[in-house]
Amino acid sequence: MIRSVVRGFGAALPKRVMTNKEIESRVDTSDEWIVQRTGIRQRYIAGEGETSASLGEAAARAALERAGLTPDDVDLIIVATSTPDNTFPATAVNIQNRLGMRHGAAFDMQAVCSGFVYAVATADAYIRGGLSKRALVIGAETFSRLLDWTDRTTCVLFGDGAGAIVLEAQEAAGTKADRGVLTAQLRSDGAHRDKLYVDGGPSTTGTVGHLRMEGREVFKHAVGMITDVIEAAFEATGTTADDIDWLVPHQANRRIIDGSAKKLGIPLEKVVVTVDLHGNTSAASIPLALDAAASDGRIKKGDLVMLEAMGGGFTWGSVLLRW
């Protein structure tokens, strides 16, 4: 059978770092409060000329270089983003053009913070279905441009950045020992759409709008939803928490990350955490964390890696893959 195997990975961050101390000068908050409630110490903020497409392009080029490939070797680009450069065309098409590609297919996916998990699942389906041989899967966000910088409940949480992986079709035995994507579990429930949303859009207000969130409601549902899709992945593959080498969660909040790991029985030393450095970068958070952990040698070839995320909608999902 065909598996979608990770060939390369890469990341890109804006030049500017914004610390909690700087946010203290903007709104009524403190470094101590932010760290205690979220685990965030800093975040990167896009500056002039830095966009979701430019960051996504840089991450894509890094992933291709790591894989020893060129844009000519890729036939599919999927970009997970809630902050596109334009309403249309897709940011993926923009990145395709920046890479000099004149072939293949490119499109965006919008599942907010779950976007990268949804995009990996979609690329895997294309590869297993024979519609793609190599796919660039990118998470790219500039959430700082959706923030109300007078709202202390949200402006402290988010940052900008991009990460990417290259998935390649490879023959496999069809067992849980295979390298590549082993299963994907996706969920959504639109009844919660008003708990985390942006109060604008082309067909309603004609404006971009600002991010709005009921933080307590999100926190209340997060751990249960996350563990649901992880347990479903275990069931689908005949694996358990003991088999996991690394849990790479969406980097939203340190308390959610720790709570999910504890409920699943996964030791914290097996959890990749970058929320302290990046803040919540939405669809970019998982590929940024993958890049960090694979670059420093923590994630190694053959490791069993669980990706999980929950985002606005609500959407949530998991991907279990062998590196």
From Swiss-Prot:
GO terms for biological process: fatty acid biosynthetic process; secondary metabolite biosynthetic process. The keyword Manganese does not apply. Pathway: Lipid metabolism; fatty acid biosynthesis. It catalyses: malonyl-[ACP] + acetyl-CoA + H(+) = 3-oxobutanoyl-[ACP] + CO2 + CoA. GO terms for cellular component: cytoplasm. The active site is at residues 113, 250, 280. It is found in: Cytoplasm. Residues 251-255 are annotated as: ACP-binding. SUPFAM superfamilies: Thiolase-like. Keywords: Acyltransferase, Cytoplasm, Fatty acid biosynthesis, Fatty acid metabolism, Lipid biosynthesis, Lipid metabolism, Multifunctional enzyme, Transferase. Its EC number is 2.3.1.180. HAMAP family: FabH. Belongs to the thiolase-like superfamily. FabH family. This is Beta-ketoacyl-[acyl-carrier-protein] synthase III.
